[in-house]
Amino acid sequence: MEAPRSVGGRIQRKPLADCTNTVSRSSQQSSSSVKFANPSLTSSLKRLVEQTTLKEKPKDVNTSATAPEIASRPITTDVRPVTRRMSADLASPASAPSRPQTSRSDMGVSDKDFTEPWSVYTVRRKASGQKRSKDASSSTSAAARIRLDLSSSSGKKTRQASENKKKTLKVAPKKRQRTVKQEKEDPVSAACQDYIEKQKAYFAEIDAFELPVEEVSNSDSD
């Protein structure tokens, strides 16, 4: 088909009967389906599929019998084409899917593993009771030792006191004889005695000497 000619520098419009640039109805439907397909919707669908597969898994993961069966089982997921109605419903912000509550058995952990702290706690309590009993026994033994030390020290003191006491003699002790010391004659004391005797004799002679008394007569007085 010829290109539209320009008259006076203007591009002529194509006639309405020209359908060269139009697209068929089937192609419009496919393009609309592609147009309404949203990557967020595909991701949400994938999450839903994964959650369903997780729920279908057996509880006991550790068992070796069920593991090959799960591996051999094909996962079939039928994804229908997204229509306009579905795309309109899903165009609104999809609510976040609730996470499945995994039980302890799904995690591969048995209830016995959670009962271990209780047994450890009881062991600790027993150990604390044993420590208390040991402390009480040690305190009683220390008190008994102190009492024994006190009694032994008092016994030692009494023994020492009894040993320090003088033992009574059965035989009477001999009396010591007094010895009279002979006085030695000192030359100084003998000279003093002689001098004293001489002085006594001298004064005795003086006392015995009498002077004669003369009587005066009347004639002499005239």
From Swiss-Prot:
Q: List the disulfide bonds.
A: none
Residue span of region Disordered = 1-189
Which residues does the annotated region (C-terminal Sororin domain) include? 192-214
Basic and acidic residues composition bias: residue spans: 47-60
Q: What stretch of residues is annotated with the motif Nuclear localization signal?
A: 155-162
Give me the stretches of Low complexity compositional bias: 24-33, 88-105
Decide whether keyword Cell division is in the record. yes
Q: Is Cell cycle given among the entry's keywords?
A: yes
Pfam hit, one: Sororin_C
| Alphabetical UniProt keywords | Cell cycle, Cell division, Mitosis, Nucleus
State the compartments where it is located. Answer: Nucleus
Biological processes annotated in GO: microsporogenesis; regulation of sister chromatid cohesion
Single GO cellular component annotation?
A: nucleus
Compositional bias (Basic residues) spans?
167-179
Q: Describe the outcome of a gene knockout.
A: Dwarf plants with tissue specific cohesion defects and chromosome mis-segregation associated with sterility (abnormal anthers containing reduced level of viable pollen, and no viable seeds formation in short siliques) as well as premature separation of sister chromatids at anaphase I. Severe alteration of root development with lost characteristic layered cellular organization. Somatic deficiencies, but barely meiotic deficiencies, are alleviated by additional WAPL disruption in the wapl1-1 wapl2 double mutant.
The similarity annotation says: Belongs to the sororin family.
Role of this protein: Regulator of sister chromatid cohesion in mitosis stabilizing cohesin complex association with chromatin. Antagonizes the action of WAPL proteins (WAPL1 and WAPL2) which stimulates cohesin dissociation from chromatin, particularly during somatic division in root cells and meiocytes during anaphase I. Required for centromeric sister chromatid cohesion during male meiosis (microsporogenesis). Cohesion ensures that chromosome partitioning is accurate in dividing cells and may play an important role in DNA repair.
Q: What does the miscellaneous comment read?
A: Named sororin after the Latin word 'soror', which means 'sister', because of its critical role in sister chromatid cohesion.
Q: What is this protein called?
A: Sororin-like protein
Gene name, per UniProt, is SORORIN
